[in-house]
């Protein structure tokens, strides 16, 4: 479900002020309080916000929790990453697409007809299901409501039965020449998928460089390509194949 322009404005206001009342939002956007309440209910169902008495606030770790939030964050940068990646996508018949919004941005732009596409993310599966002639496989497992993704031992075991031509994925952070995740569950799923793919492409916008991640996934040099929109000047790229 896409956000309306008004809901995007609500999200921007909450990013600035952290918490706002229905009355203030209604006055600021020149609509009725009933309209704002409907917007907030929809946004709460997406995992974008939390409702408070008479208003709304951003959830803790909002950037990690919701794919809808992540799709809105740095949207233009993610579009640039996707655009940069398209000419470098190798021929493939099967692909694993992780739960990242950046990988989804690319998947929406490439031809997936007559391809096998496997993902652990509900929203990614929904978007890809709109394409024609795709053999789409959604992995099962413990589904996290906010992230819309399946993780856990069962999900990992399913991945072990595949051999993919290609993996399109992102990460939470790039630190010291390595990819990191904030969630151990996401890290474990990506690690298993990584081991069952022939070609691996990492998609990261420049804000991921120097960001914080707790769980180390792998060295950037282990990827066939690292696609970004801009490389910060202090990043050592001598052993890594960047596209930007």
Annotate the PLM regions.
Residues 2-5, 12, 21-25, 30, ...:
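Conserved phosphate- and dinucleotide-binding cores of soluble alpha/beta proteins
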Residues 74, 95, 117, 148, ...:
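Glycine- and other small-residue-rich loops at beta-strand/loop junctions that grip anionic moieties
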Residues 97-98, 119, 228:
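Short beta-strand scaffold positions
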Residues 108-111, 115-124:
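Catalytic core of membrane glycerolipid acyltransferases/transacylases, capturing the structured
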């Amino acid at each position: 479900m896409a956000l309306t322009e008004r809901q995007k404005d609500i999200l921007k206001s909450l990013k600035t002020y952290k918490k706002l009342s229905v009355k203030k939002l209604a006055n600021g956007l020149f609509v009725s309080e009933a309209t704002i309440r409907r917007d907030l209910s929809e946004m709460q169902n997406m995992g974008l916000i939390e409702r408070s008495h008479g208003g709304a606030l951003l959830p803790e770790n909002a950037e990690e929790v919701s794919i809808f939030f992540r799709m809105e964050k740095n949207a233009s940068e993610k579009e640039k990453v996707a655009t940069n990646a398209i000419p470098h996508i190798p021929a493939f018949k099967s692909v694993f697409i992780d739960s990242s919004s950046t990988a989804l941005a690319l998947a929406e732009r490439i031809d997936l007809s007559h391809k096998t596409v496997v993902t652990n993310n509900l929203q990614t599966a929904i978007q890809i299901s709109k394409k024609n002639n795709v053999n789409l496989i959604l992995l099962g497992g413990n589904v996290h409501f906010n992230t819309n993704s399946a993780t856990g031992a069962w999900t990992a075991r399913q991945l072990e039965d595949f051999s993919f031509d290609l993996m399109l994925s992102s990460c939470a952070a790039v630190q010291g020449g390595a990819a990191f995740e904030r969630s151990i569950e996401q890290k474990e799923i990506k690690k298993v998928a990584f081991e069952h793919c022939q070609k691996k492409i990492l998609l990261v916008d420049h804000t991921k460089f120097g960001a914080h991640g707790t769980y180390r996934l792998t060295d950037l040099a282990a990827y066939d390509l690292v696609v970004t929109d801009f490389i910060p000047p202090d990043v050592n790229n001598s052993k890594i194949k960047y596209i930007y």
